[in-house]
Amino acid sequence: AEYWSILFNIALYRRVGTLDPGAARRLIIEPVRSYSLVYDDLAVDKMLRATGGHPYFLQLLCYALVNLHNRERRNYLTIEDVNSTVAEVVGLGEAQLALLWSESTPEEQAVLLALARLLSAGEPGTQATIAGLLEESGLGVSRAWIAEAISKMVRREILQRGEQGTGRYEFTVDLMRLWLEESKSLGLVVEEVM
């Protein structure tokens, strides 16, 4: 991760936020229209959820899907095709995901891993459920501590608030959640924080 941090620090920094849903859909559909490549509506919806409309991750996913289209010579891609390429895209985007991770404090990392585990289990990602999971893992922390970590990650656009009034949080780019599940251990991060 240090290598990537050095590499990314030699370039000019430009904040790249997420695209609005309409612009993200156009980025998916318009470049391949002249090649007769069509995405199923469910595939486009899945692409938007996985990438959060972030142009970098959206481009990686489109790249993987166009490669699939070229290999299999199909003009219609489905949600199953998107699902089958997600692991590849996590690998392609690992440097950026690792950089976001390395720029997070150990406390933020603990919250990220707890949230990833909760969401993967179909549980709501609230401050209370995050606190409960961290406590089960041996890290008893206050809600204020969790709120501060979440607030910082919302400002950095790693996390976003879920539906209004639910108190839930989710990953802005769901690929981050998948990467965390594959490559990081909540137990090890909890030990570091303690």
Regions of interest found by a model, annotated:
Residues 64, 152-155:
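Alpha-helical DNA-recognition elements
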Residues 165-173:
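Minor-groove-contacting beta-hairpin "wing" of winged helix-turn-helix DNA-binding domains
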Residues 38-41, 53-145, 193-194:
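Winged-helix-like regulatory helical subdomains adjacent to P-loop NTPase cores
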Residues 154-164:
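A short, conserved structural fragment
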Residues 147-151:
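Short, hydrophobic-biased segments on the C-terminal half of alpha helices
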Residues 94, 174-194:
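Short, amphipathic alpha-helical interaction segments positioned at domain boundaries
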Residues 1-49, 71-74:
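Helix-loop-helix "sensor" segment of P-loop NTPases
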